């Protein structure tokens, strides 16, 4: 449950793909064409013989009657259909122009080099300042007013029903979904929602050689930065439920961002229960190491031998040298590669590296870690091996968290989320980024002790866990855990580890 809000945020966001706009235009044409053929047809003057043209016009006439009936029921006109079709076609052209301009500005050689395999968001407004997006402004300049946006869902529904009727098939159509997203784009506010062009790696050999569509896929993305109301509305559909995790605190933040306060405001009872760790405290050693803050400014690039990097390798190697399997979590896969290489030079035991991969490779790596003698597994704290994995028994003797795994704050969508949370809570960075990062760190060290008879070592390696400062995170660790994670200096870590080993 601790990841409910960040994971659901994507599910309650919308997007309309370039290809979907293309397909919606095609579907609209299939509905419009019989109406125009029926209107333009005339009596040939000789009904003694039936020609191919006659049969086409007869079929078009029958289809036209069916479509007119659907239009009448939905209060949608032929003019609405034609206007929405023109809007989608022009919108696709505008998307094409903007993607081309973006690639020309950021990667002038993109036509020759192809995709750089990097997905990105191209913001349509300043992410830090809520305001009208550039697509909405373009539409107004192009003469597309409220009507074309607001009637898009009804037009999409008519297209679906009409094509079902005249095609006599049970196909899935694009126009309804496009219409709903287009309407949401128009009516949703500009603080809760952030609008951008989503550009992703793709390969389409049928696209023109000089088109970005050959190597990229683009969509108009409507990101929900504050999904609490949407989550609350969905939770309200249930008679009751339990949201459970060992890392929900701080509870006031969790209640707000997951929609529980939204439910409570509607009169639904929301009850909190907190349970301590039932295992003997003498079986676990928990340390918050006062090492230099593992920020990019302090540590430098992975190839640099800075004092900060040296301190982290030294401390991590001390823990990793302990008997048993050791899990090491870093803020990113790039840092994981660096740490794994550094540990291989220091340790006698095998060092396994988890890289961003598919489920099969991850399961294979996990099996290798569990089999045989003592090993070290280095991974990203944003991966899947630091939470939700069973390390019970002798599978894990220690876990080390290096730094606070705060996500990239330069990404446009992240900056928009921070700005939205700033306006809701006044502490957007802490609510949107710091609290989830600390939860991930706590999840990682929580892999160690899974039963009453297990012993293990838990290490939070960063001064921000150890002592108060302007950007510390110690206050986001629950009080009962803060008492256990006693601050130690890097020099005293080895002594503390030896004392714990002797106590067993």
Regions found by a protein language model. Name each.
Residues 250-251, 255-265, 342-346, 392-397, ...:
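Short secondary-structure boundary/capping segments
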Residues 281-284, 359-366, 408-415, 488-496:
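Short, charged, surface-exposed secondary-structure boundary motifs
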Residues 290-302, 361-464:
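Conserved RecA-like P-loop NTPase helicase motor core
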Residues 460-504:
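N-terminal targeting/trafficking signals and adjacent low-complexity tails
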Residues 311, 343-368, 372:
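Conserved C-terminal RecA-like helicase domain
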Residues 1-308, 313-326, 331-334, 338-345:
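Conserved coupling segment at the C-terminus of the helicase ATP-binding
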Residues 267-277, 350-362, 483-500:
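A generic structural motif
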């Amino acid at each position: 449950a601790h990841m409910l809000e960040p994971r659901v945020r994507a599910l309650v966001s919308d997007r309309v793909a370039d290809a979907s706009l293309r397909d919606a235009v095609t579907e609209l044409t299939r509905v419009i064409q019989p109406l125009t053929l029926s209107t333009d047809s005339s009596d040939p003057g000789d009904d003694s013989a039936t020609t191919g043209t006659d049969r086409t016009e007869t079929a078009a006439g029958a289809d036209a009657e069916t479509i007119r009936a659907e239009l009448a029921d939905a209060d949608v006109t032929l003019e609405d259909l034609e206007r929405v079709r023109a809007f989608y076609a022009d919108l696709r052209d505008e998307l094409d122009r903007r993607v081309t301009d973006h690639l020309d500005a950021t990667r002038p050689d993109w036509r020759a080099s192809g995709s750089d395999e990097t997905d990105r968001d191209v913001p349509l407004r300043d992410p830090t300042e809520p305001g009208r997006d550039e697509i909405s402004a373009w539409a107004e300049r192009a003469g597309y007013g409220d009507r074309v946006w607001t009637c898009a869902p009804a037009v999409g529904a008519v297209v679906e029903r009409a094509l079902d009727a005249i095609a006599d098939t049970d196909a899935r159509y694009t126009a309804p979904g496009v219409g709903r997203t287009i309407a949401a784009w128009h009516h949703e506010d500009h603080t809760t929602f952030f609008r951008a062009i989503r550009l992703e790696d793709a390969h389409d050999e049928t696209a023109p050689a000089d088109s970005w569509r050959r190597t990229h896929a683009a969509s108009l993305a409507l990101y929900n930065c504050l999904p609490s109301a949407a989550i609350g509305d969905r939770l309200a559909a249930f008679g009751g439920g339990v949201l459970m995790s060992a890392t929900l605190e701080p509870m006031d933040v969790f209640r707000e961002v997951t929609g529980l306060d939204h439910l409570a405001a509607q009169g639904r009872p929301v009850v909190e229960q907190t349970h301590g760790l039932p295992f003997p405290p003498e079986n676990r050693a928990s340390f918050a190491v006062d090492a230099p803050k593992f920020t990019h400014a302090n540590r430098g690039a992975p190839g640099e031998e800075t004092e900060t990097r040296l301190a982290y390798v030294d401390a991590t190697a001390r823990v990793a040298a302990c008997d048993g399997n050791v899990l090491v979590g870093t803020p990113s896969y790039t840092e994981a590669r660096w740490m794994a290489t550094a540990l291989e030079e220091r340790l006698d035991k095998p060092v396994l590296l988890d890289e961003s991969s598919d489920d099969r490779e991850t399961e294979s790596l996990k099996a290798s870690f569990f089999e045989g003698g003592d090993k070290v597994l280095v991974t990203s704290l944003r991966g899947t091996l630091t939470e939700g994995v069973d390390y019970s028994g002798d599978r894990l003797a220690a876990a080390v968290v290096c730094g606070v795994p705060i996500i990239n704050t330069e990404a446009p969508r992240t900056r928009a989320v921070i700005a939205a949370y700033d306006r809701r809570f006044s502490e957007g960075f802490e609510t949107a980024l710091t609290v989830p990062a600390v939860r991930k760190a706590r999840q990682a060290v929580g892999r160690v002790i899974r039963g009453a008879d297990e012993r293990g070592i838990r290490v939070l390696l960063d001064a921000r866990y150890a002592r108060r400062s302007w950007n510390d995170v110690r206050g986001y660790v629950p009080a009962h855990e803060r008492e256990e994670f006693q601050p130690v200096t890097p020099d005293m870590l080895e002594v503390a580890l030896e004392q714990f080993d002797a106590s067993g």
